[in-house]
UniProtKB/Swiss-Prot annotation:
Keyword Methyltransferase among record annotations: no
Organism classification: Bacteria, Bacillati, Bacillota, Bacilli, Bacillales
PROSITE patterns linked: NAD_G3PDH (PS00957)
Localization per record: Cytoplasm
Molecular-function annotations in GO: glycerol-3-phosphate dehydrogenase [NAD(P)+] activity; NAD binding
Keywords, in A-Z order: Cytoplasm, Lipid biosynthesis, Lipid metabolism, NAD, NADP, Nucleotide-binding, Oxidoreductase, Phospholipid biosynthesis, Phospholipid metabolism
Annotated function: Catalyzes the reduction of the glycolytic intermediate dihydroxyacetone phosphate (DHAP) to sn-glycerol 3-phosphate (G3P), the key precursor for phospholipid synthesis.
Organism of origin: Staphylococcus aureus (strain NCTC 8325 / PS 47)
An annotated GO cellular component: cytosol
Protein name: Glycerol-3-phosphate dehydrogenase [NAD(P)+]
Length: 332
């Protein structure tokens, strides 16, 4: 039995906390919202994010950062990318011993263009860092929490962290593979959110299967181009952390990125769509980061560029689709 602190009480953090508890581990969840903490401790639910799920009664929650830090030597960082650096820094200020960090965020930091493991590494003093890894792949929280068969990848620069992650999470409904390509697994998880928003737009407009298939295929091509430029193994993008995550996020209404895109395709403004969803949509922030990163690295990413124009330059969806279709002739 292992003690694990889960930082973040969103949908995926909650679903994975449930997996860990059912696997026999001691789990403490940390969140800022006292009402959510009280609900979990009293009712064993988190209805804001997982409306109908009844959680393992052994999961406990707290809003006390010091208590959360002292509880365990393994931390599951289940926070939005934009909150990761701040919370990791707060954790670092209170650490007195080495900890292992496993994150499940799928984004690229605005401004620095850093992957989430790099953000954590920046924030945690070396004397307190026992290793950093990621758990990623096609894994909707809504399915994990009701024990639908799910398969994901665990990766780290340190193979022992990947193996630890595999051992902690794997059971008869969650299969975990290890993968040595941390860069590729993190980039696959982050970049597919861009394509998922675009895929939602295509569905919202009412375009057919031809357009959806083309978008995912060409989206994977530009993900691979940038990934290879940044040091990833292109083969990673043909695995769970790449095309696996891409397919599930581009085809399901469980995906908040797809849902945002669908609403935009239906003619809603971004503010209107986000107000209805009341959830963090990583694809917005990732699009901004990757648009500028691709320009800096001189990588051609036409779908990302088009989505950036829709999200941040108020260009119409149909105009961007027209521009994509009328680009110069190219070889695949």
């Amino acid at each position: 039995m292992t003690k694990i602190t889960v930082f973040g009480m969103g949908s995926f953090g909650t679903a994975l906390a449930n997996v860990l508890a059912e696997n026999g581990h001691d789990v403490l969840m940390w969140g800022k919202n006292q009402d959510a903490v009280d609900e979990l401790n009293t009712c064993h639910t988190n209805k804001k994010y997982l409306k109908y799920a009844k959680l393992d009664v052994n999961i406990i929650a707290t809003s006390d950062m010091t208590k959360a830090i002292q509880f365990a030597d393994i931390y599951l960082m289940a926070l939005p990318t934009k909150a990761m650096r701040e919370v990791a820094s707060q954790i670092n200020d209170k650490l007195t011993s080495k900890k292992t960090f496993i994150h499940v965020a799928k984004g690229i930091e605005n401004g620095t263009f850093k992957r989430v493991s790099e953000m954590i590494e920046d924030s945690i003093s070396p004397e307190y860092n026992a290793g950093i890894g990621v758990l990623s792949g096609p894994s909707h929280a809504e399915e994990v929490v009701v024990k639908q068969p799910t398969t994901v990848a665990a990766s780290s620069k340190d193979k022992s962290v990947s193996k630890l992650t595999q051992d902690l999470f794997m059971n008869d409904y969650l299969r975990v593979y290890t993968n040595d390509d941390l860069i590729g697994v993190e980039l696959g998880g982050a970049l597919k959110n861009i394509i998922a928003v675009a895929s939602g737009i295509v569905a919202g407009i009412g375009y057919g299967d031809n357009a959806k298939a083309a978008l995912m295929t060409r989206g994977l091509a530009e993900i691979s181009r940038l990934g290879e430029k940044l040091g990833a193994d292109p083969m990673t993008f043909l695995g769970l952390g790449g095309i696996g995550d891409l397919i599930v996020t581009c085809t399901s209404t469980h995906s908040r990125n797809f849902t945002l895109g669908y609403k935009l395709g239906q003619g809603e403004s971004m503010d209107q769509a986000l107000s209805e969803m009341n959830m963090v949509v990583e694809g917005i922030y990732t699009t901004k980061s990757v648009y500028h990163l691709a320009k800096e690295k001189n990588v051609d990413m036409p779908i990302t560029n088009a989505l950036y124009r829709v999200l941040f330059e108020n260009i119409s969806v149909k105009e961007c689709v027209k521009d994509l279709m009328e680009r110069d002739k190219k070889s695949e």
